[in-house]
Amino acid sequence: VLEKFSGERFDNYVKNHILNPLGLYGGYCVDSLDKQKFVTLYEYNAKNSNHFSPSPAAYHPRRDEIKNYTLGYTTPIFSPTGGMKISATDLAKYMTMHMYKGSYKGTKIISKKSAKIMQTKLSDEENYGLALLQTTNLIEGKLMVGHTGSAYGLYSIMFFDPKEEFGIVAITNGCNPVYTKGFNDALRRTVNTLYNNLIMKK
C-alpha cells in the first residue's frame, strides 16, 4: 500500500520520510549501510548443549533482488516487520517520537491524530493498535505502549508510558527465549531493572 501511493521503494520511503528527518542512522537495505557498524547476532540453542551460533543471514545483501524490484510485490525482501537495522540509541529516539504523538525535537513525522490511532487498541483480545501494543504485563501498575522484535537470535523491546512520559529500549541476542505473559523473560527483567533503578527512584 505504501509503495503504491508513494511511488517509492519501501526502504527508501522509510529512510527519506522517517529516519533522515529524525537524524537516525539505520535502514532496511543492508547494502546501503556501513558494515563496520554491524554486530554479529548469535542464536541460542538450548537443545544443542546451550550452544550459541552466529546468524550471518541477518545481514544478507539484497542487491540481486533489488535489480529486479517491482513496487508492491518485491517488498518482503526487506522483512518490513522486523528487518530494520538500527542502534538502541536511535531506536529510543524513534520511540520518543511516538511517545510525543508523532513529533521529536520539532520534527513532525505523523499527525497527533494518526499517532493516537496507532496507539489505540483495536480489540480487547490482542490489545494492538497499528503495530503498537498496549500492556500492563511489562511493568506492574503501568500501562505501556510499544513493540517487541525477534529475528536471527536478536530480541528487542521498545515500550513507553504515554502518561508519565518515560520509555525503555533494550536489545540483546543469544538468550534463552522463555516467555511469561507474552514477554521474553530476559528483556522483562532488563526493563524492570532499568525502571526500578533509573526511573522509579527519581
Per-region residue spans from a language model:
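Glycine-centered structural positions embedded in regular secondary structure
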Residues: 129-131, 167, 182-184
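Short, gly/Ser/Thr-rich active-site loops of penicillin-recognizing serine hydrolases
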Residues: 174-202
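Short, well-ordered beta-strand elements
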Residues: 144-147, 155-159, 164-175
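Short, surface-exposed loop or secondary-structure junction motifs
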Residues: 1-145
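Solvent-exposed loop/turn segments at secondary-structure junctions
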Residues: 84-85, 98, 151-153, 174-177
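Short intrinsically disordered coil segments
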Residues: 57, 147-150, 186
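Glycine-enriched catalytic-core subsegment of oxygenase/oxidase enzymes
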Residues: 133, 145-146, 151, 178
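A structural signal for short secondary-structure junctions
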Residues: 124-126, 137-139, 150-153, 159-164
